[in-house]
Amino acid sequence: MESVSGPRQKAWLDCLPDTPNGAWLRTQLLADSPALVLSWERFFSFQAGRDPLDLLACSRALAAIGAYEEAAQKLRLALAHDVRHTFFSRAEKLVYRLAGLVRSNLRQCKIAVLGSSTTNLLVPILQALCLRDRIGAEIYEGSYGSIKQEIWDANSGLARFRPDIVMLFMHWRDLHLGAVTDDEEVWISQFIEERKADWRRLSDSFDCHIIQPSFDYPASEAYGHLASVLHGGRTRVIDLLNLRLREEAPANVSIVDMAAAQREVGTLRWENELAWIRYRQHPAMEALPEFAAAYMSHVRSVLGLSRKVLVTDLDNTLWHGVIGEDGLDGIGVGPGSPEGEAHLHLQRYMLDLKYRGILLAVCSKNDFEDAQLPFLRHPHMALRLKDFAAFRANWEDKAANLRAMGHDLSLSLDSFVFLDDNSLEREWVRSQLPEVAVVEQGSSPFHYLRQLDRGRYFESLSLLGEDLARADQYRVEAKRTSLRTSSCSLDDFLQKLQLEGTVEEITEKNLARVTQLVNKTNQFNLTTRRYTAAHVYAIAQDPNGWARAFQMSDRMGSYGLIGMLCCRPVDRGDLWEIDTWLMSCRTLGRQMEKFMFDRLVEAAVDRRIGRIVGVYRPTAKNGLVKDFYDQMGFRRVGESDDEVRFELDVPATPVVTATHIRNVTASAGAVRP
């Protein structure tokens, strides 16, 4: 519909009622202007759900008047839906425009795309998903079919680009397998060695993270099911190869499960023979959003943007019915009804998330006692009260409850995922807390689990002991909070805790956990530099620098490995510069930062370091530590838009500042700092 102007426009607009249809017609009649934006917002106020194409149109209107951050937010809301590849084509120009203008990104990174098939339709989708995930990405697209040349040519475009992350796009045709391979083990070993050589070259050249796909399967097999059982059968060889890829991949290489993506899309939609023959397009265009989403889940994990908390509603989400109206016998969960079984399957999935370290929380409009009743007395509930790190059941709005929950858990809201059957509640949380990931689950309980899983919100590249113990740690933290409340002062509380600290070298044993902290810690993080495992290890191995990891415990249990501090040597031999100083927010207010400072000064005295330079690089999340160096006795020596620099003259005799933490490093057998 063409827009109109002047008296004719006014006449049209004056005739339109203030209804959903009237508001939509206004959006079609108005040209780009603030009035058009207001018309879109009025239209959205009538809607329980929002169509991605309407959100895209509103985003364009906002961008046209220079409201780029607001435009990006509307586009992010559109991209949070399950959109088809045609949507990305419509949004492409706007995505690239906003990518260069928005400043609300959480991370910046350089991503290289190297493919054996055509990637020019894939890259715009990746760019859009980066915008959705608040990643300021500069993307380099290698030439078609030139993976080897890009990796091994010292003068290639990749070498000039110097990526942080390299995405490799390969598929079953690259294996050049016949229906049957004579010696499958020899062939697999040779192929793996070629991949490992490429990985080493990339790692040595760029210190980057590599995202390598496992291999998908041909849509047609002449041998049928025999291809998976015969020695050397193509399906069997691909199965074994994919297993070896996962086993052989080093820490800085993650393997994308292409077989899972192929299953998600469906083999018949995954491949388009005509598109391959004509354009060397693989997978098919309609499969590209799912294909790109699989890779982006790894990017988020590498950058520390995976979600940590699943917050769920109760009525018609964890069970069928309303507990306050239907009572314990009236709600449905478990055997007895299809809906009840669907809710039980969702609970079991959530319980598995909890076992792998994801925190579970409840946010429900309910009376507190009613909300707890099914967890205490219903025989078929898979989840129990002990499985939740936070439980909020009241009549306050859910956005306010989520904010309070974030404060209580000491976690930022961009680590939250929100699950609710009520579309109005979902829209309210989206509008008030855009950083929270809201699952667009629909209204049928048979879709809840699938939609939650498809979001890949909790993707992780490794599973550490600290992850598995996370839920227990938060339960113990509740006991500490109770002790704090009963203590007459902070000193009294810290004394009762009986805190102990340990300092240890960064080795292959703890490298994964240290790297995880480097890429996930936001609040107590002086520089917020993000490094690969290889980079962290290289810093730790510098004989002229100093890098240590820190553990903490008290009378109630261990906090685990919760901090890292590393210094780089400066040109002159008696000067260190603090490269990274970070600490888990779970230990705030326990003097752990002072314990780390004390160990740093001890090491500096031992190494005859005269001065230590501290650097504070402000971000949207680390304002907590903006005055930290001042508090620790450093003096300000310089300031720019990007950072503030401090210096400390190392005292001849160290003074203990962490008076409430006992250093048990020696008794634990760790290396002297």
PLM feature spans:
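Alpha-helical cap/lid subdomain in secreted, periplasmic
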Residues: 5-52, 65-68, 77, 101-106, ...
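Serine-esterase "nucleophile elbow" of acetyl-processing enzymes
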Residues: 82-142
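Asp-based phosphoryl-transfer active-site loop
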Residues: 308-323
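Substrate-recognition element of Asp-dependent hydrolases with the DxDx(T/V) motif
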Residues: 345-376, 392, 429, 526-531, ...
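A conserved beta-strand-loop-helix scaffold within acyl/acetyltransferase catalytic domains
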Residues: 377, 502-586
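Conserved Lys-Pro-Asp/Glu-containing loop-to-beta segment of HAD-superfamily phosphomonoesterases
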Residues: 402-423, 429
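Terminal substrate-recognition subdomain of acyl/acetyltransferases
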Residues: 408, 430, 434-499, 602-673
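Acyl-donor binding region in acyl/amide transferases
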Residues: 552-555, 561-639
